[in-house]
Amino acid sequence: PAMARGMIKPLVSFYIGGMGTYYHAMFCRYGWEANANEVRDLYNAGKRKEAAAAVADDLIDAIAICGPADHCRAKLQEWRAAGVGTALMNLPTGAPFEMAAQLLRTMAP
C-alpha cells in the first residue's frame, strides 16, 4: 500500500493545493484541516514534492484503495456494500493499455 499511496499523493496534493478552494475546504470539513492546510501551503509555495509527501496516509486510505489486488478487491467490495456505486481507477501516467485491461479484469466483480 505504501508504494500505491505514494503514486496517488501527488494527485491529491494537486486537488488540495492547486485547484482553488473547493477541495481544500472539503477536506477541512471532513476532518483533515491541519493536513489540508499544510499540503496547500507547501503546494502554493512551489514545494510540490513536499506537498505530496505531506498528504496523510489516513486521508489517502479514506478516499482511495491502494495495495495488492486481494486487498483492493476486498476494499472495493466493502465500499460497494456501503453504497458506493461508481469507483474511478487511476493508473500511472503513460501506463500501457494492457496494464489498464489487467486492472479492470482483476477488479471486476
Give the location of each predicted region.
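Active-site-adjacent structural elements that line small-molecule/cofactor binding pockets in enzymes
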Residues: 1-109
